Amino acid sequence: VYRLFTSMFLHFGIEHLVNNMLVLFVLGSRLEQVIGKLRFLFIYLAGGMTGNIFSLILELRNQDFSVSAGASGAVFAVMGAMIYVVIRNKGWLGDLSMRQILVMAAFSLYFGFTSSGVDNAAHIGGMIAGFVLAVLIWHPRKKRDQQMEIYDQL
């Protein structure tokens, strides 16, 4: 069971680590400002674990086992949560639009599916988990308070 957690902190090389951290920096810092540190941490860790569990279930089903490492499932959970937050904020969060997030997600998924050795199941599982977790744990304040929070970010 611990491998489902610890694999989020291992990477197959510097490029793998840098790609994950770049997306995490761009989206994660904004998401954390809106939903708070504890909710962000919960979505990151639980979303990453859920992505890894989703991957494991598919591996067991297909009897096709491989080594899995990386924060991608957790990063995709952040992406999924960010999609929900932006939907709730009428398509924008500061200077970040829904279109930009969806393009980032589409490119990330495209590169995953066109490259070998990528755990796409963890990516998709993480993204779904992040979206669902955000729905369950983030309830924006009244519209006026939420707008003021967005303006404070600018």
Regions found by a protein language model. Name each.
Residues 1-154:
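A detector for small-residue-rich transmembrane helices and their helix-helix packing motifs
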